[in-house]
């Protein structure tokens, strides 16, 4: 694994993320410190589905509360940027969305939370589509109602795939989060077309805004772009130093499965697998059509 991270860091990759359940980070004393050596432009995507034992048992088959706590403590000790990633099942952990966000804000190393509606592909024991499927708009509503920090205009569609991805930004002050997405000029997100709003007066600001609302904008780069945008807006008080540690990002990313497959959605996909033979395959089709299945025992 370390060899793979090192190889990625040697290449022209803007930001490397390690997707992990956190077990080794929690249990091996020097593991987090070794990962921290790859900063900057490196981040941990930590599986974090719930705070309750019952929900974790249902989704992961184990009570991972202690593992999560130990992993976060070790990441906090080394100051390694971390995003919490929650798979959301209706009736299981959708009532904990606000609690997860509040918990995330307590850790200085956490840069935000990524919520993913459950996708019925691969290992998904006990999933009943009629009972457990949840859509992005329901998660967005839960963020607004349960957390109480973001308003209606603070979670907006991602331009590359507005049906599947929403994003919102806040500025961190200790454990307090101040929403800022509603301050972005909304007309700058409108696709340019005849008789539409023109952007000649602020072309650079629009370019920066679109760059910020991109899945490729992460780490210190997102902090820099956010600072450039907010400096252009009136009545925005910025911290003296706006680094990545002051940015708190909330995203909702939904993927397609056999029940909601949509070719137009695949064509707009922002997330891909790169295969050893050089092909680039959308995430939504990789698990359904391309992933190798284990043979009979």
Which ranges hold each PLM region?
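Flexible mid-to-C-terminal extensions adjoining Fe-S/redox cofactors in radical SAM and related proteins
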Residues: 198-297
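Sterically constrained small-residue positions within well-ordered secondary structures
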Residues: 35-37, 160, 262-264
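Radical SAM enzyme [4Fe-4S]-AdoMet core and its adjacent flexible, acidic
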Residues: 58-59, 65-66, 76-244
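Long, contiguous hydrophobic alpha-helical segments, chiefly transmembrane helices and signal peptides
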Residues: 18-19, 45-48, 85-88, 104, ...
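Radical SAM/AdoMet-radical enzyme domain recognition
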Residues: 1-117
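Sparse recognition of residues in long alpha-helices and their boundaries
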Residues: 24, 129, 293-294
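Residues that cap or initiate secondary-structure elements
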Residues: 24, 52, 90-92, 175, ...
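A short linear-motif detector with a strong N-terminal bias
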Residues: 23-24, 93-94, 146-149, 249-253, ...
């Amino acid at each position: 694994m370390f060899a793979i991270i090192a190889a990625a860091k040697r290449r022209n990759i803007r930001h490397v993320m390690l997707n992990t359940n956190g077990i080794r980070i929690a249990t091996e004393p020097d593991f987090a410190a070794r990962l921290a050596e790859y900063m900057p432009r490196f981040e941990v995507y930590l599986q974090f589905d719930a705070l309750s034992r019952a929900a974790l048992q249902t989704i992961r088959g184990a009570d991972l509360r202690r593992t999560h706590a130990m992993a976060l403590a070790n990441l906090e000790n080394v100051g390694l940027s971390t995003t919490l990633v929650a798979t959301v099942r209706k009736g299981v952990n959708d009532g904990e969305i606000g609690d997860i966000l509040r918990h995330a804000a307590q850790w200085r190393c956490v840069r935000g939370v990524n919520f993913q509606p459950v996708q019925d592909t691969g290992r998904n024991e006990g999933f009943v589509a009629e009972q457990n499927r949840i859509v992005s708009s329901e998660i967005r509503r839960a963020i607004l109602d349960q957390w109480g920090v973001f308003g209606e205009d603070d979670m907006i569609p991602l331009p590359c795939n507005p049906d599947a991805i929403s994003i919102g930004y806040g500025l961190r002050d200790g454990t307090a989060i101040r929403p800022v997405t509603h301050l972005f000029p909304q007309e700058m997100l409108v696709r340019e077309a005849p008789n539409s709003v023109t952007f000649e007066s602020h072309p650079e600001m629009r370019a920066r805004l679109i760059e910020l609302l991109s899945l490729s904008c992460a780490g210190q780069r997102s902090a820099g772009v956010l600072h450039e945008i907010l400096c252009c807006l009136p009545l925005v008080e910025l911290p003296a130093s706006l680094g990545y540690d002051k940015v708190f990002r909330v995203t909702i990313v939904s993927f397609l499965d056999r029940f909601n497959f949509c070719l137009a959605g695949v064509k707009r996909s922002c997330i891909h697998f790169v295969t050893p033979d050089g092909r680039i395959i959308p995430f939504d089709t990789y698990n359904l059509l391309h992933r190798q299945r284990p043979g009979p025992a």
